[in-house]
Amino acid sequence: MRNITKILTLILATCVLAACEKEEHVNGGTVNVKGAYVLNEGNMGPNNASISVLDIDSAKIDNEWFKNANNNRMLGDQAQDMVQYGSRLYVTVTESNTLEAIDTATGHSTQVSMGSLKPRSIATHGGKLYISCYNPPCVVRVDTTTLTIEDTCFLGSYRPEGIAIAQGKAFIASSYLASNIYSYDDKVYVVGLDSFKVAATVTVVCNPTPVVQLDNNTIAVGCIGNYGNIAANTVLINATTLGTTTVGIGSTKMAVYNGKLYSYSAPYGGTPSYAIISADGSVSDFPFQPSIGGNPYAIGVNPSNGDIYLANDGNYRVPGDLYCFRPDGTQRFKEEAGRLPSKIIFITD
């Protein structure tokens, strides 16, 4: 394990030297991928969220990366989201009410209290973090230099989830009521970054949750439905006109590769399905039918070669497994990650 950690540390340091302060971006062009960060959400209560680091060349994974770099401190209780921005990873830990700002070269983290906000999803723009929060329903703007909250935009009664930015606007999913988790909204808030006020709302489908930027003018929203008579769906929003395209299939999680969404729909009690969605709303078949020994919980596509990464949920009882498949469906490797691996970020030069 020490040798693995040394190799991974060298990879991370090399990548940081080549890094520059840039926006969280839609992939494209030639990139060199050396590894991946895996956010392990952890179960509610046991304080077992973590971050794993994968060395792709050796197919070795270090599940103690964050813990070892921070004097045996665990990440916290239910890590929700992770982004890389410049030389740092930023992680929201909902039940711990914290934001972690992690130096990617060393793994050392500055922990920031978020009071009782219950931070959820993160987007980045202009040296700021934009974080959706449950309590109260709002989005906050955090300066990445001072790690302080600069401003707050309140969003109404429903709890917000995913957030993405395009055309000078933040798009935030309005999901469900705190007082009644079975009362769902069907709106996406549009917040102007300059005014930091709600400029509009866009009607989508019941229970919008994940939100990603598909391209410079397209926002994709996965709508989970009500687990009953309203089916899951995916809605594409034109970031300029705020017009919508309803795709007709659900997206529990999404990853962007070459201008397309690689998505899966994993309804409770149902069989997972996989698809590729284009910006015009057309749907094509996934290149293969993944077999990952359980329900999917994360998806990512290596921007350098199109390899598809999927993680399962370990049935919420044991650590999940991370699978890597070539585009033709051939399995390259399988490695055990942490509890509930939920997000994959590739480490690029």
Task: Show the residue positions of the predicted features.
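Bacterial N-terminal signal peptides that target proteins for export
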Residues: 1-8
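C-terminal motif of bacterial Sec signal peptides marking the signal peptidase cleavage site
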Residues: 16-19
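Predominantly soluble domains enriched in secretory-pathway, periplasmic, or organellar proteins
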Residues: 21-349
